[in-house]
UniProtKB/Swiss-Prot annotation:
PANTHER family: RIBOSOMAL PROTEIN L25/GLN-TRNA SYNTHETASE, ANTI-CODON-BINDING DOMAIN-CONTAINING PROTEIN, RIBOSOMAL PROTEIN L25_GLN-TRNA SYNTHETASE, ANTI-CODON-BINDING DOMAIN-CONTAINING PROTEIN. InterPro entries: Rbsml_bL25/Gln-tRNA_synth_N, Ribosomal_bL25/Gln-tRNA_synth, Ribosomal_bL25_short, Ribosomal_L25_dom, Ribosomal_uL5_bac-type. It comes from the Bacteria. Keywords: Ribonucleoprotein, Ribosomal protein, RNA-binding, rRNA-binding. Belongs to the bacterial ribosomal protein bL25 family. One of its GO terms (cellular component) is cytosolic large ribosomal subunit. This is Large ribosomal subunit protein bL25. Gene3D superfamilies: Ribosomal Protein L25, Chain P (2.40.240.10). The lineage of its organism: Bacteria, Pseudomonadati, Pseudomonadota, Gammaproteobacteria, Enterobacterales. Part of the 50S ribosomal subunit; part of the 5S rRNA/L5/L18/L25 subcomplex. Contacts the 5S rRNA. Binds to the 5S rRNA independently of L5 and L18. The keyword RNA-binding applies. One of its GO terms (molecular function) is structural constituent of ribosome. NCBIfam families: PRK05943.1 (NF004612). This is one of the proteins that binds to the 5S RNA in the ribosome where it forms part of the central protuberance.
Amino acid sequence: MLTLQAETRKEKGTGFSRRLRIHNKFPAVLYGVKKTEILLILDHNTTFNLQKKIEFYKENLLLCVQDKKYKVKVQAIQRHSFKSKLLHIDFLYVE
C-alpha cells in the first residue's frame, strides 16, 4: 500500500491554490458519504512520482494527515493542460 503525507488547510479559492503551487504544493480534498470533508495540501514532487505507478490508481492508499491515517482511493485528478503538473486531487474514504 502506497503512503502519502498531507497537511490540512483552511483556505479555499484560486488565489490560495496559486500561492501553494508557487511553493511546489497543491490542494486536495478527502470526502465520503456521511463524512466531513477534509481540505488538504500535498507536496507536488512526491505525489507526482507516486502517481506514475499503476498502484496509485488501482489500489487503496494510506493518507497520513497530521497524526491520523485514512484509507483512501483516488477519485479524480486535475492536471495542467500542457505542463506535467498536478493541479488538484479528490480522494474518497474507503471503509
